[in-house]
UniProtKB/Swiss-Prot annotation:
PTM sites of type Leucine amide: 57
Tissue: Relatively abundant in head, thorax and to a lesser extent in abdominal carcass and anterior midgut.
Top-rank taxon, per record: Eukaryota
Primary residence: secreted
Effect in UniProt of substituting residue 34 to D: In strain: GAM12B
GO biological process: antibacterial humoral response; defense response to fungus; defense response to Gram-negative bacterium; defense response to Gram-positive bacterium; innate immune response; killing of cells of another organism
Compartments where located: Secreted
Name of the protein in question: Cecropin-A
Role description: Antibacterial activity against several Gram-positive and Gram-negative bacteria. Antifungal activity against A.fumigatus, B.cinerea, F.culmorum, F.oxysporum, N.crassa, C.albicans, C.neoformans and S.cerevisiae.
One cellular-component annotation, GO: extracellular space
Naturally occurring in which organism (per UniProt): Anopheles gambiae (African malaria mosquito)
Amino acid sequence: MNFSKIFIFVVLAVLLLCSQTEAGRLKKLGKKIEGAGKRVFKAAEKALPVVAGVKALG
């Protein structure tokens, strides 16, 4: 019975410590995805007037 309480405490402590290191990796991944999204948005912003003009002609 005592071992299970200690085991649960150790598992919770490890999860708390590991969650801090995971946040850095996830933050970096999120920034990369955000940058890619911005590039796609800017490219679409440039291409949409051209596409609208071609569609109006055709």
